[in-house]
């Protein structure tokens, strides 16, 4: 029924609109058929039979919509520019199809021919019942579909969904990036010392608002190595022993100074005497000489203290050899200080106070042998295991032992000279008891020297055994071979014991000859001759 697009000036939307009207008309036709059957049930059977007989051949027939559409198309083809006729057709269609008086109850009693808009009996196109509201909804949906087709809607919704998904994906990525960026920024200000100053907004640099402990907890350098206690202990012992001697000399000085003003006051009151003046002058000169000697000894002690402090600081950062040199040198300086302190007061003091001197000498002499034992390097695990030691350890032990022997010999030679001076002084001044004590001390010192000499000899023997890398490697290979040989010996012993046991079993079975004994012999021979 559709003409070609070239002959019709109507647009595709208008043609679709007309086709929709045809569909609505067919729907109304089915609706009218249903209403006629419902109205016929109320009437008598005679009237229904008459209507059924008269329905296939009606007297007057209304024009169908299909006829109207065909007429409209013909008119449009004849007069293409007449738009008024098209408007009239639309109005007539609207008034005929969408008339509300059709569905009213008052018109149900009228004849079916007047009611019927569309003719019955259109073949093969019976549509179910539909009310006018449904038809209007269909029409509105068709109009909306002409304005906005559903395909575009679906496409737009899909595109919008994809865009929204992409947008959400990008937002999630941005949030993750923000979180990852926020994490380090949250950690950094906790460690920064300027956090509180920045938060408070104070322009002045307050020392209270800046906490430097947070920063320098991790950056603090590791403390230097503490020096070995065996090397520093003897120096401290001598310092402690030297202090009481200095205090005693100061106390004596005060005692000697106190009578001088009293004597001078008595002399001024009595106006007599050159003798008392000479005594006071001699006492003052002796006190002056004592003060000078004390100042010298104190300066020497302070210098020795500084040297020991330098030695202890050098121990932390220097090598072991330097620390040993410094300890031996500090020991020699302290030993030099002690005899000077003891010799000078002897010349200045009077012979009445000579009896008190040996006690001071004993106090200073008692601790003297202590530091030399401590300065002797003790036998370490290195020297005891030097035969099986590695290359580095053997070389170190050699160098250390040789240097230590040289240093200790020098220090012992230096220390012998002041000891001889100290021995001479008490012999000339002290009693027989002091000489006995000195003899005992000398014997103890000689014994200690002998012990030291024995130790040095044993060390030299041990250190002289491995000299070169080649010998060290040779010793290592020998030890490895020894272990392997021991393992092989153990294995051979076990194997021999097993063979002996099996041979004893065989000898026992030799007395019982038979088929079972022969089988056992074969099995035992197989097991003994098995190649592992």
UniProtKB/Swiss-Prot annotation:
Compositionally skewed regions (Basic residues) per UniProt: 347-356, 449-461
Biased composition (Polar residues): 67-80
Protein name, entry field: Uncharacterized protein F59B10.2
Positions of region (Disordered): 26-84, 97-129, 157-470
Residues annotated as signal peptide: none
Skewed-composition ranges (Basic and acidic residues): 157-181, 237-249, 357-368, 389-403, 410-419, 437-448
Residue ranges, compositional bias (Low complexity): 30-40, 198-213, 259-290, 298-315, 326-335
Domain of life, source organism: Eukaryota
């Amino acid at each position: 029924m559709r003409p070609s697009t070239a002959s019709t000036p109507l647009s595709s939307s208008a043609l679709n609109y007309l086709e929709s009207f045809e569909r609505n008309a067919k729907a109304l036709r089915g609706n009218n058929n249903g209403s006629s059957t419902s109205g016929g049930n109320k009437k008598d059977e005679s009237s229904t039979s008459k209507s059924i007989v008269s329905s296939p051949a009606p007297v007057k027939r209304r024009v169908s919509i299909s006829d109207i559409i065909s007429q409209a198309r013909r008119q449009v083809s004849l007069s293409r520019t007449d738009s008024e006729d098209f408007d009239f057709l639309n109005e007539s269609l609207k008034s005929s199809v969408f008339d509300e008086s059709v569905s009213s109850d008052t018109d149900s009693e009228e004849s079916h021919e007047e009611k019927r808009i569309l003719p019955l009996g259109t073949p093969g196109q019976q549509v179910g019942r539909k009310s006018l509201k449904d038809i209007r909804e269909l029409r509105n949906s068709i109009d909306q579909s002409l304005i906005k087709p559903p395909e575009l809607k679906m496409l737009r919704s899909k595109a919008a969904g994809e865009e929204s998904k992409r947008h959400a994906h990008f937002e999630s990525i941005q949030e993750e990036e923000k979180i990852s960026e926020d994490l380090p920024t949250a950690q950094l200000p906790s460690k920064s010392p300027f956090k509180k100053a920045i938060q408070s907004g104070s322009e002045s640099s307050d020392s209270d608002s800046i906490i430097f402990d947070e920063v320098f907890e991790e950056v603090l350098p590791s403390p230097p190595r503490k020096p070995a206690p065996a090397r520093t202990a003897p120096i401290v012992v001598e310092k402690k022993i030297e202090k009481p001697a200095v205090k005693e000399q100061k106390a004596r000085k005060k005692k000697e100074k106190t009578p001088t003003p009293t004597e001078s006051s008595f002399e001024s009151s009595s106006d007599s005497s050159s003798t008392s003046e000479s005594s006071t002058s001699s006492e003052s000169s002796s006190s002056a000489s004592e003060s000078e000697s004390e100042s010298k000894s104190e300066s020497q002690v302070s210098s020795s203290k500084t040297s020991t402090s330098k030695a202890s600081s050098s121990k932390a950062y220097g090598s072991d050899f330097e620390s040993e040199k410094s300890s031996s040198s500090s020991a020699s300086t302290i030993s030099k200080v002690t005899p000077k302190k003891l010799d000078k007061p002897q010349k200045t003091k009077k012979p009445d106070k000579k009896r008190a001197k040996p006690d001071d000498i004993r106090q200073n002499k008692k601790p003297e042998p202590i530091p030399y034992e401590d300065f002797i390097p003790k036998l370490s695990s290195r020297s005891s295991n030097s035969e099986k030691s590695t290359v580095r350890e053997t070389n170190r032990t050699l160098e250390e032992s040789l240097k230590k022997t040289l240093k200790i010999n020098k220090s012992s030679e230096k220390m012998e000279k002041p000891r001889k001076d100290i021995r001479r002084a008490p012999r000339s001044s002290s009693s027989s008891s002091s000489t006995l004590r000195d003899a005992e001390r000398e014997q103890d010192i000689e014994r200690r020297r002998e012990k030291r000499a024995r130790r040095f000899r044993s060390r030299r023997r041990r250190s002289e055994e491995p000299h070169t890398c080649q010998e060290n490697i040779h010793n290592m290979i020998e030890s490895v071979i020894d272990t392997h040989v021991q393992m092989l010996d153990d294995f051979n012993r076990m194997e021999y014991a097993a063979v002996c046991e099996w041979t004893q079993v065989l000898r026992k079975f030799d007395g019982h000859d038979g088929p079972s004994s022969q089988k056992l012999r074969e099995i035992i021979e197989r097991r003994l001759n098995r190649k592992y």
